[in-house]
Amino acid sequence: MYYIGDTGETFTPEIVLGSGCEGKVYYKEDTNEAVKIQYNEINKITSLSEESALRLCNIPTNYILLPRRLVYDENGKYLGYTTTYIPKNKEIEELDVQKYTLKTLTAILIRLYKDAYEVSKYGLCINDVLSDGNYIFNGSYYLIDPGLYYFSDKDKEEILKENISKINTFINYTILWDRIQEIQNKLIERGSNYTICDYLKDEAKEDETLIGLIRRKVK
């Protein structure tokens, strides 16, 4: 039996969503939450501390998934957290992202950048975006498992720049498969807060698909 949030709502784990080196993730059907229960010996490097998890609970995001409520045992010991449950990940090939128009793809990707702007206001630096299993795609992209995210005292603009760079890296390698060298050149040339969405808006022809852009740019 576990206890969730300030009210001590009881939770008995039954439906396992997955497991890893840090712990197990369960489904809480009545509130549509994923509940991450960390193993007794918490890895201080890859697992969120109670203090960090509490701070993350106060950051409003939709696509960079952060803790929403903390989980405790019967003695009040912190064991994990809940987050919004997103339906099972689908293979990118199954949804054939390359056939999306760039207008549609941009509308999907810009959601990650909006969340990057939001977390930067709180001094949060996202991290570890290229590890296997750290994102979900079901028609939208979600970044999950913030175990290596960290708070920084740097200037908020500098944090935003770093977070945008991480999202750019995620999109370039996960979705575009680093096929368009011109994107890297543009990101270096424009610097600062230039995003891949900016590139797609600049370069897209009307109703062009992603595969059409790749074929046009990769000779």
Predicted segments with their positions:
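C-lobe/activation-segment region of protein kinase-like
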Residues: F137-K219
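Conserved kinase catalytic-core helix
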Residues: L95-G133, Y141
